[in-house]
Amino acid sequence: GRGYGKGELYSTIYTGRSIGEEIDMKRQVTMEEISDGKLYSSNDLVKADCGDCEGCHACCTGMGSSIVLDPLDIVRICRGTGATFEALLAGKIELNVVDGIILPNLKMTGEEEGCGFLTREGRCSIHPFRPGICRLFPLGRYYEENGFRYFLQVHECQKENRTKVKVKKWLDTPNLKDYETYIARWHGVLIQLQEYIAAHPESAKAVSMDVLQRFYLTPYQTEEFYSEFFQRMDEAKNIL
């Protein structure tokens, strides 16, 4: 990975503990406080492998509304479980306002405030099709003008003595380059929408309803997902 200048603020990051970018920017947190001081590409080695999380599910509890789900997350979970988005809203996920936009997130329930997909044994019941934030953790995304790189959060994962693993292996995501392009463009859409809503607060509800209907509620017909998503994104430009 490549380092960065001392004191550089991370104004556009995604840690997985929040939709992240603006929230953390407002806190004016520096990269030195939360990372190992390096930025990584998908081909780099990083100390993130936690041994299959044996005996631990700390990052699956007490996360509040921070595990925000993007459209591909919903597609994966719906196809993997056979449930509709509406059915998931009845129990496993919920809607919350994130910087003015209504978005879905994993719902924490019970005394332990655990993810609804966590088994009694403390294991993930949707691991093969788990959300992107769960795949990413304990890494975060550092957004730049032309995409993003990854960084390692050093205070979040409770597992000690983590071993090195290639970022792309850790993410365990097919067609990773397409996925990274999708994530960067989705991030860009959210930023644009947040700016639009900030300038036109009276339109917040209508914009959120359009986002939910266009990107989440309307089923994706193709197995591949990305081309259909990008088509919908192009069609959505006229609402900005």
Q: What residue spans do the PLM features occupy?
A:
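Short loop/turn segments that flank or connect secondary-structure elements
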Residues: 22-86, 90-114, 118-240
